[in-house]
Regions:
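Alpha-helical membrane segments in multi-pass integral membrane proteins
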Residues: 52, 60, 70-74, 81-84
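C-terminal helical cap(s) of enzyme catalytic domains, especially alpha/beta-barrels
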Residues: 12, 71-74, 97, 106-135
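Conserved anion-binding
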Residues: 1-62, 127-135
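Catalytic cores of alpha/beta
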Residues: 35-39, 75-79, 83, 87-106
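Charged helix-capping and loop-helix junction motifs
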Residues: 34-42, 65-71, 118-124
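Flexible, glycine-rich phosphate/dinucleotide-binding loops
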Residues: 26-28, 90, 112
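Glycine-rich phosphate-binding active-site loops on the catalytic face of alpha/beta enzymes
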Residues: 1-4, 50-62, 86-87, 97-121
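Distinct, well-ordered alpha-helical segments
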Residues: 11-13, 32, 65-71, 93-96
Length: 135
């Protein structure tokens, strides 16, 4: 995921690589996502018209309602969708399975030991993998 740049899209296309840009207005660090659900969905449709067939959406970093955005986006967009940002609990993992995106990413929740408080990064990752395997 990164902001959409036509030059990046063209370069990756020339080298047979997939490009999964962010959609909506993304800013800050950690990143936040702004825009109405309709604007974000339209942004994806506009990018699909340029040949983009996969997206990285920072749904839980949305300034309004991340879960609602994720549900509406995945229902409206016929493309690979990876949900990124703040997937930091078993409840949110369950929600990912319910929404059904192509995938989701997880980062800081593993470093901050959200799943095994006294565990290592590897132990936290293993706890998530074990949990998901049972789904």
């Amino acid at each position: 995921g990164t902001l959409y740049y036509e030059s990046v899209h063209n370069y990756l296309k020339e080298h047979n690589m997939t490009y999964s840009p962010f959609v909506g207005k993304v800013s800050g660090s950690p990143s936040i996502l702004e825009g109405t659900n309709e604007e974000i969905i339209q942004n994806a449709k506009d990018l699909m018209a340029k040949g983009i067939d996969a997206f990285d959406i920072l749904a839980y970093r949305h300034v309004v309602d991340g879960e609602k955005l994720a549900r509406e986006f995945c229902a409206a967009i016929d493309a690979k969708v990876a949900i990124a940002g703040s997937i930091s609990s078993y409840e949110r993992i369950d929600t990912m399975f319910d929404i059904g995106p192509w995938g989701f990413t997880m980062g800081s929740a593993l470093f901050t030991k959200n799943f095994v408080p006294d565990g290592s990064f590897k132990e936290n990752l293993q706890a998530v993998a074990d949990y998901m395997e049972k789904k």
